[in-house]
Amino acid sequence: MPSVLCSPMDFVTVDGITVVGERINPTGKKRFQQALREGDMNYILEQAVSQSEAGAQVLDVNVGAPGVDEPAVMEQVVKALQSVVSLPLQLDSSHADALERGLRVYNGKPIVNSVNGETEVLERVLPLCKKYGAAVVGLAIDERGIQPSADARFEIAKRVVDAALAHGIPREDIYIDCLTLTASAQQQDVLATVEALARCKTELGVRTILGVSNISFGLPCRPYLNTTFLTMAMYAGLDLAIMNPSSEEMMAAVYAYNVLTNRDKQSGRYIARYADRVPASAALAKALQDKAASGVPAAAEAAGPAVSGPYAPLMKAVEQGLKGEAAACTKALLAEKEPLELVLSLIHI
C-alpha cells in the first residue's frame, strides 16, 4: 500500500523520491538558534516558505537548541507553519514531550522523526505515533551507538520495525533511516549505509529515509558529493530524502530519477518543472550569437554594458567587489549630489 502524508490543505503520496526540506533545524545555524531563543517566528516561517517554493514536499521541523523550551516552541512553530504553508510536516525531536505537543496541534498526518532501537525510546514514542496516526522514522541505532557494518544496522532496523508493527503502526507508515555518516570522518562506512538501506527496502518491505547532506560535511564543493550520494541512495531504494531543496543539482537528480524509473508518469512533474528552462551556458551562447548577428561584438556583450561619465568609477568598483573604493567613489559623488538623486541616477543607468 502507498504511504500518504497530509496537512490541512494538501497531501503527499510517497510513490517516488520525496523531498523533505531540511532547513528548519538549528544544528550548526547560529541565526536559527537565535530566532528560536528570541521567538522570531518570521525568520522561521521564511525558511518554510522558501523551501516550499523551491520544491520541497514535506518539511522537517526541529526546534531543539540550548536555552529553548522545546515542547512549547514545537507547539508554537507547528501552529505557525500550518498558517503559511500547505506541506505536511515531519516533527523531528528526541523528546517525547516535544513530539506530543506538536502532534496534538497538528491537523493532518505527519511523520515523527524519530525512534531508535532502544527499548525505552520505542515504548515511549511508538504509542504516540499510534495515538495520533503518524508515520514514524526508525533510526538504525541503539544503546551501542551507530554500528559500522550494514548487517548490524539492518538487525537494529528489523527490531524497530517489529516493535512498530506490534504497536499497530502499518508497515507502509514505517520509514527506516540507516544513518548517513560524514565521508570526511568515516569514509569507510559510507557504503554500509547504502547496503543497509537496500536490505531494509527489499527484506523488510518498509520505506526508507536519509539525511543526505550529512555525507559532505567538512569537505569542499559539497553539492558534488551530496548529489552523487543521493543518486546512489535512490538506486538502492531511498524514498524520503532530507535535503536542501534550494540545491538545483540535487533537485535535478530527484526529478530525473523519477522519470527514468517510471515513477513520474509521462514525465509530467519533470516537464512542469523544466520545460521553460534553458541551461545557463546555452542561454549565454544564444545571447552572444544574437548580439553578433546584430553587429555588436560578442566581447562587448560579455563585458556588460559600458558606463561612462561620473558614475563609471563607482560602477567599476562595485562590479569588482572593491568595497573601500566603492565607498570612496560614493563619498565623492555625494559631495555634488543629493543621496536620492544619486540613487535614482544609478537605477536608470
Residue ranges and their predicted role:
Residues 1-22, 26-31, 210-216, 220-345:
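Active-site loops and adjacent core secondary-structure elements that bind or stabilize anionic groups
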Residues 18-22, 59-61, 89-92, 110-114, ...:
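Hydrophobic faces of well-ordered beta-strands that scaffold small-molecule active sites
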Residues 51, 102, 176, 233, ...:
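Conserved, mostly hydrophobic/aromatic
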Residues 52, 103-106, 124-133, 166-169:
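Acidic (Asp/Glu)-rich catalytic clusters
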Residues 70-93, 97, 103-106, 195-206:
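Alpha-helix-loop-beta-strand connector modules within alpha/beta enzyme cores
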Residues 131-278:
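Catalytic alpha/beta core domains of metabolic enzymes, predominantly
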Residues 347-349:
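Conserved small/polar residues in nucleotide/adenosyl-binding loops
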